Amino acid sequence: MTTTVPKVFAFHEFAGVAEAVADHVIHAQNSALKKGKVSRSTQMSGTSLNGNGNTESKTMERVNSVRSNASSRGGSEDGATKKLKKEKERRFKIALSGGSLIQVLHEGLLKRDDVQWGKWDIYFADERLVPFSSSESNYGLAKRKIFDLIDTEKYGTPKIYHIDESLINDPQECADNYEKILIKGFAGRDSVKLPMFDLFLLGCAPDGHIASLFPNFQENLRENLAWVIPVENAPSGPSNRISLTIPVICHSHRVTFVVEGATKAPVIKTIMERPEKGLPSSIVNEGAAGRVSWFVDDDALKDVFVIKKKYKFYDDENLTE
């Protein structure tokens, strides 16, 4: 693995992280809604991160199957109608992980008046297979801390795509079902071999796992066919989960890590100074090189040797990124 240095924005305190992340999210939203999407299918879709030449054909079989079923139900439209509909229905597609990231978004986004919630399609980077009422549920936490608090009459209602709660006792079936949801959400776009999120938001745990991709689960980290995988016997927290895979994360237009707290400092040091260790986030830093940003407070950057940048807020929307 070569050394790839992402952008690292440093902050003195949690409040600064929350405000900057919110600004970053809004900029990504505005870029997506104003500019549309730039396809990277030729960059990522035909070539596996791990060299599996069969990935493209097998993935396309799954995608085409779902698209065929959807088309048979929905009839057909001429090209001009499709183009007009696409422009009118342009959406901001975002993936969220759970944990402390939800609190960061709660603090930063809910006080903003420029969030176009009604144009958001929200997916989850991973999910713990527990009831939504559980404090361990990523969707449940996001619902209580964010979704239930949105003034939908003023800002609109986001479309939220979560797992089927009735499938939490079967990790494989739950993962397969959520993958079908992703395929339906992205298969009509230019890039269909892999979904391309406008923004993929992640945290990073003290043990180095991101989403539900754990450092010592090498088979999961090498997965390059499935979009969503089951994760069983997780070493911390709920043992059964599902997770989006490394290729899906790396295919996003922007990938952003949000990390705070002194307990994260050792793992951040390893990620930034020893990428050859192959932690999941180091793989993402490499696989999505040039599109990765880290928002980290000073506590998590203690004794970390890395170039730190000061985040500049977008006073005026500049869509040159």
Curated annotation (Swiss-Prot):
Name its GO BP terms in alphabetical order: carbohydrate metabolic process; pentose-phosphate shunt, oxidative branch; tRNA export from nucleus
Gene3D superfamilies (UniProt xref): 3.40.50.1360
Which residues carry the post-translational modification Phosphothreonine, per the record? 320
- Biased composition of type Low complexity is found at 63-74
What is the protein's major site of localization?
Answer: cytoplasm
Where are the stretches annotated Disordered?
Answer: 36-85
Q: Which UniProt keywords apply?
A: Cytoplasm, Nucleus, Phosphoprotein
Cellular component GO terms, alphabetical:
cytoplasm; cytosol; nucleus
Q: Which CDD domains match?
A: 6PGL (cd01400)
Read off the SUPFAM superfamilies from this record.
Answer: NagB/RpiA/CoA transferase-like
Which family is annotated?
Belongs to the glucosamine/galactosamine-6-phosphate isomerase family. 6-phosphogluconolactonase subfamily.
Q: What NCBIfam families does UniProt report for this protein, alphabetically? A: pgl
Q: Identify this protein by name.
A: 6-phosphogluconolactonase-like protein 1
Query: Which gene name belongs to this protein?
Result: SOL1
